[in-house]
């Protein structure tokens, strides 16, 4: 028996892979307590298990199973007590570069600390909190422009790759594990952060203020507040602060200028919905300037529409090029898994012009990327439409 315990896209992905490779009768899932069976900004493990006909179990039920081949925790919300299991093949993919950032809020601390690298780590589960022997990890870069939600999305994508890399050896038992060291081993408990109070501390340097805004920026749950307004961007100016930290030096239509310990900053407030609605006709120069009014190039609304998705649907190749130069994902997907290329396909068919489509493919757009119904772009095309796109499909 294989057990998947957890939540979100990584747990759903693991379940889909296992069912595809081994069948649905060999696996059971333990969804997190707050999994209501509905997809939102992340997919529901409970919903996917029901769709696939996979058994849903409780932790207590699983602890009694004797023939567990693999127990894998993927963002699971309960403490695993390995001594309660009938097996020692209990593993976790932790969202940090262990031994660093044990515990909670692993999307927050690397951002506020200004880290340039992060990782996802596969480890054995022991009686400690994220202290088990390390089997493997996958490292990746963290941009200075990344918010906490951007880091979380990178965790998800890299954990999928780590899962693919180690699934077979976890099942066979043909792997080695190394004890964690004590150097750079830090632990953050639940009480280390209070997301119910996201008013920013202004008695700090300009750099610290910017890191706070980026670290608290996780739109599905909250945006940081300054003067009670959702805040998305901090621009550090070259003007040394002459007034006390937190003093408002100037006010604009959608920003304020504030003093800090060292340099004045421009603070921009959230305008995402207006920004997205204006992309179809917005001049490129205005677009570049208005990027300060959203939480980064991969920001998205409640439908999962990001700037590059909206630009693709409306055929704004100039905007797409600018977004890609700033780090936007060419394979971005909305909350149904609809990709940038799928949106571009609609524009090209409406205008009978495939130049945008060809541009995206040449830049690395994946024509075989699956949406969350398990369909790729070709599945949505008629024979005439396939002929229109030619050999690209």
Please give the residue ranges for each predicted region.
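One-carbon transfer enzymes
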Residues: 1-220, 253-267, 271-273
């Amino acid at each position: 028996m294989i057990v998947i315990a957890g939540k979100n896209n990584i747990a759903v992905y693991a379940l889909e892979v296992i069912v595809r490779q081994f069948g649905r009768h060999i696996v059971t899932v333990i969804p997190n307590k707050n999994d209501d069976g509905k997809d939102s900004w992340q997919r529901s493990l409970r919903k996917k298990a029901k769709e696939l006909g996979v058994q849903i179990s409780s932790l207590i039920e699983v602890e009694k199973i004797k023939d567990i081949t693999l127990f894998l925790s993927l963002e699971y919300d309960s403490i695993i007590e390995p001594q309660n299991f009938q097996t020692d093949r209990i593993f976790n993919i932790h969202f940090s570069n262990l031994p660093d950032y044990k515990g909670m809020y692993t999307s927050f601390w690397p951002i506020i600390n200004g880290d340039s690298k992060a990782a996802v780590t596969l480890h054995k589960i022991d009686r400690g909190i994220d202290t088990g022997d390390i089997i493997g990890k996958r490292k990746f870069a963290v941009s200075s422009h990344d918010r906490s939600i951007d880091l979380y999305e990178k965790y998800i994508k890299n954990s999928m790759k780590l899962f693919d890399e180690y699934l077979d050896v976890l099942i066979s038992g043909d792997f080695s594990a190394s004890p964690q060291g004590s150097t750079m081993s830090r632990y953050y408990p639940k009480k280390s952060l209070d997301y119910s109070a996201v008013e920013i501390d202004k008695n700090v340097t300009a750099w610290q203020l910017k890191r706070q805004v980026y670290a608290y920026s996780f739109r599905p749950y909250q945006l940081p507040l300054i003067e009670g307004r959702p805040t998305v961007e901090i621009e550090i100016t070259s003007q040394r602060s002459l007034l006390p930290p937190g003093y408002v030096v100037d006010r604009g239509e959608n920003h304020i200028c504030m003093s800090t310990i060292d340099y004045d900053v421009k603070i921009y407030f959230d305008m995402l919905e207006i920004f997205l609605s204006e992309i179809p006709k917005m001049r490129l120069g205005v677009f570049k300037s208005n990027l300060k009014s959203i939480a980064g190039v991969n920001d998205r609304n409640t439908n999962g529409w990001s700037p590059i998705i909206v630009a693709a649907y409306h055929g704004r190749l100039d905007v797409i090029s600018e977004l890609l130069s700033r780090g936007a994902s060419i394979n971005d997907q909305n909350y149904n898994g609809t990709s940038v290329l799928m949106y571009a396909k609609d524009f090209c068919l409406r205008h009978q012009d495939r130049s945008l489509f060809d541009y995206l493919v040449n830049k690395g757009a994946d024509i075989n990327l699956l949406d969350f119904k398990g369909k790729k772009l070709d599945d949505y095309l008629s024979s005439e439409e396939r002929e229109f796109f030619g050999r690209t499909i």
